[in-house]
Amino acid sequence: MPKLRSATSTEGRNMAGARALWRATGMKDNDFGKPIIAIANSYTQFVPGHVHLKDMGDLVASAIAEAGGISKEFNTIAVDDGIAMGHGGMLYSLPSRELIADSVEYMVNAHCADALVCISNCDKITPGMLMAALRLNIPVVFVSGGPMEAGKTKLSDKIIKLDLVDAMVAAADSSVSEEDSAKIERSACPTCGSCSGMFTANSMNCLTEALGLSLPGNGSMLATHSDRRELFLEAGRRVMALTKRYYHDDDETALPRNIASFKAFENATALDIAMGGSSNTVLHLLAAAQEAEVDFTMADIDRISRKVPHLCKVAPSTPKYHMEDVHRAGGVMSILGELDRADLLHTDVPHVAADSGENLSHVLARYDLVQTQDENVRRFFSAGPAGIPTTKAFSQSCRWPSVDDDRQNGCIRSREFAFSQEGGLAVLSGNIAPKGCIVKTAGVDEDNLTFVGRARVYESQDDAVAGILGGEVVAGDVVVIRYEGPKGGPGMQEMLYPTSYLKSRGLGAQCALITDGRFSGGTSGLSIGHVSPEAASGGAIALIEQGDEIVIDIPARTIVLNVSDSELEARRQAMDAKGVLGWKPLNRQRYVSLALKAYALLATSADMGAVRDRTLLEG
């Protein structure tokens, strides 16, 4: 039977000083010997997805105390990608993932915590905490802040649903009046919570359900709904149950590395592709797999992407559905249920929502709308929006008149009635990206699944934005933005502004964009990111010249620079001959802080999840 980790600092005469300090935090004599559960919160007033999390730790703590544990809460940083976007702040977004992972590890290991509850929500916070949890391998439950309600406004006598991307596109579109642009801006983000579409934050919170590390509804229940309160309480109860299973019953299935196994990563990827999740999820799944010491690679993602259909279509891929609609249709568990019926899911895997001796199949039996006979579950998934602007969690209790269990025409479809038999994400490869790149096919117009165009090359996102807004980019161009990868940026910026501006200029379906950077979960259109290797690491994207023909074929999973191998090799030799000036952007003026330089020094390309290069650390 494993000994409590916390005993290191709470038992024996030699720990009198540590116990004295524990007492100063409020612990009493009878608290020593109880499991100490760390609560990693990410409350901040900077981020709408986190502005309501201040009191969530107390909810979790109350359930832990009731179950016989001691909780100790700490906070991590949280960067808002939407606010950091379009300026130098975006350089810090992806590197913050590593800082969050490290800070959770530091706090948990320094204080010998026995288990962990991760209160996350937005883009890099959930992945950072996930990496830490798998690195630490102690009992863990994730519970997120939940998605915000979709914005709604009245334009031309019609009520339309909105999100952050709509505000950006409208503001850049000269045909939209100042009055309408202001209406959209004020309505796009009405409540606390992660942005309302299937962007990176919501995608990752859904994936924690599929990995088996969070409770049903975690990815879809609205931040504002009173039903979400129970998720925080249940997270506290569940982490205590897992803690007892591991430390008392010696049950290693309670540990995250045994829950988030290779099969679980396959499940998460299948979910991601079925729901057309953010392309950033690929980056984070690859990074998490490395922390879990699971040999899960881009090749596995490619393999799964070729057989999983697109079962759930959500903004930004359609204006019709947002996360509130996904929840009404049964959330992640109902998408997993459809994958199971299509024989595309492993159900013999552990899950934090499963009791001892159970697995995912038992969780689906309770929570998949097609299977369940439980009226309480159907009521749970009827939780809906109130349409009242607020920054308060649990501020409303509105319900849809019925759940959406229409698997032919609803938000979630069966395989037979899928939005498309091709999934929502695809891995492409070719001489531009020999180690792969990612496209969110859910957001690509059918007419653009194959595209041939001229290269319009930019050495930075800023230059690309200027070129798009200045009229340099025309229909038929393939916009190439390079030296924006993890090492070259550094920080692998998101390219939401270039794609939004292409849309606002009417070029969204007439141009393609490829980059060694990445895209916001809010991106749609023929946007291909994560080109690997990146330009700064000797990737062929650095060898593309103005006017080169680029051929993109999504059905064939290829992306090809239409020049001969000999010409490409000659360009490579010419670049190498530049010495220290080679594989660097031309004439780019960008301040890079010491912190970012340290990140760049160890960063790998996107095909490795943009994690640290361990070969440089292991000697």
From Swiss-Prot:
It comes from Shewanella denitrificans (strain OS217 / ATCC BAA-1090 / DSM 15013). Homodimer. Keywords: 2Fe-2S, Amino-acid biosynthesis, Branched-chain amino acid biosynthesis, Iron, Iron-sulfur, Lyase, Magnesium, Metal-binding. The keyword Nucleotide-binding does not apply. It comes from the Bacteria. GO terms for molecular function: 2 iron, 2 sulfur cluster binding; dihydroxy-acid dehydratase activity; magnesium ion binding. Signal peptide: none annotated. SUPFAM superfamilies: IlvD/EDD N-terminal domain-like, LeuD/IlvD-like. It catalyses: (2R)-2,3-dihydroxy-3-methylbutanoate = 3-methyl-2-oxobutanoate + H2O; (2R,3R)-2,3-dihydroxy-3-methylpentanoate = (S)-3-methyl-2-oxopentanoate + H2O. The modification N6-carboxylysine is found at residue 124. HAMAP family: IlvD (MF_00012). [2Fe-2S] cluster binds at residues 122, 195. Its cofactor is [2Fe-2S] cluster; Mg(2+). Disulfide bonds: none annotated. GO terms for cellular component: cytosol. Binds 1 [2Fe-2S] cluster per subunit. This cluster acts as a Lewis acid cofactor. This is Dihydroxy-acid dehydratase.
